[in-house]
Amino acid sequence: MVYILIAILIFGVLIAVHELGHFLAAKACGVRVNEFSIGMGPQLFHKTKGDTEYSLRLLPIGGYCAMEGEDEDSDDDRALGRQVWWKKFIIFVAGAFMNFLTGLIIVICLYAGAQAFYTTEIVELNPDFPQQGEDGLMPGDTIYAINGERIYLKSDVSLIMGLGDTGTIDMTVLRDGKKLDRTLTRQVYTDENGKEYEAYGFTYGGIVEATPLLRLQYSWYQTMDYVRIVRLSLQMLLSGAAGVNDLSGPVGIV
């Protein structure tokens, strides 16, 4: 029960932050906001300042930003429907941008105490790896992209390699500041017990000491990773690689 309440509260905060983005953008664009509410249901507190009524409501399940002319025609020059297209666009995307910014701030806070980060540096090659050397891979190379997807974090490598893995990957590495394109194919190797297994034959994941700048950099990388996961999920859904049964709404997530 406690976890359900926490989940509901988190969803409420996400929605309230989203609506705050619409509110701030509307105010900045000169659109009249009739009411900005945090929460839903009966009012616990309200105060009118200027043309806007600010409300705090009983149920912590979101909020709303009621703009003039949002749902019906209005003669007010400050109505949403009477604004130029670019102002409408800014107001429309401001909610999602505020959620993105909030996520970035949360990740920055989580990484504030990090002491070190894993990199995408190749640290070791299997002795039988067939593409060693200048024309292949070398320890110290940094994985930059796989199959056209930019690699930011160590976890990205396994994520991207696992998407529709056909046994061959196109990899871009950084070596001495230069980008080098390589095509790798899974090979059959033998472990110390004589058992055969398939692998690409490289080990990655160096360690770098965290600095204030690196904490910000990796916070940005992690946030962009979350955005990419959403994009890839939508692509898989549209392409048929994932079905609607793999999706969950708020109730399923809770």
Q: Residue ranges of each PLM-predicted region?
A:
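Alpha-helical transmembrane spans of integral membrane proteins, capturing the lipid-embedded, hydrophobic core
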Residues: 8-15, 92, 96, 100, ...
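Hydrophobic alpha-helical segments
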Residues: 9, 22-23, 92, 220-222
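Hydrophobic alpha-helical segments, especially transmembrane helices
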Residues: 23, 58, 88-89, 100
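A residue-level signal for conserved active-site and pocket-lining positions in enzyme catalytic cores
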Residues: 56, 95, 223
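PDZ peptide-recognition modules
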Residues: 71-86, 98-254
